[in-house]
């Protein structure tokens, strides 16, 4: 499977072990996105939240094409920010649409700095952490002023909460596994 991922990436990235590993990690995350987006879109449709499903599909497409932007000459940092930016905008839209901080998907904001750290290191992670933090404060203020709608309730909220916890746990484990693999590759390169 990794050979397939490697065939997508430009050979020029091989010169720098860190960039090569970051590009591989980005490709794995894009593949996971490609597998999960149809399932998520179907789940939102079954819950009567077609608008959410369409936004997930749109953001997912952007995230899925990021490895191909590397082949088109985009630097790894720009591809990383394209991927994380699509994830971030998706989470902002979902938080606003599904009820602010109480939305069952709000915890997924944690993936923005986690993915940025995995692919780019501490600086991008701190930048995305600051952006996520400011967004959470803005959502809190909007929520307190009554600007946002009421959070979901009933079966849809319960299903989304369950799916969010399980999905976030699985992706956290994947990110940790990729980070561990990247650290091992870096140690071998020394």
What kind of region is each of these model predictions?
Residues 23-102, 107-115, 132-137:
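Hydrophobic transmembrane alpha-helices and their membrane-interface boundaries in multi-pass
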Residues 119-141, 161-162:
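The cytoplasmic-loop to transmembrane-helix boundary for the fourth helix
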Residues 10, 143-148:
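Transmembrane alpha-helical segments of integral membrane proteins
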Residues 20-33, 122-126, 157-169:
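Alpha-helical transmembrane segments and their helix-membrane boundary motifs
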Residues 83, 112-127, 165, 169-181:
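Short helix-perturbing small/polar motifs within transmembrane alpha-helices
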Residues 4, 8-11, 166-190:
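Juxtamembrane or sensor-core-proximal signal-transducing alpha helices
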Residues 146-156:
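Membrane-interface helix termini and inter-helical loops of multi-pass transporters
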Residues 11-22:
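Cytosolic juxtamembrane amphipathic/interface segments immediately preceding
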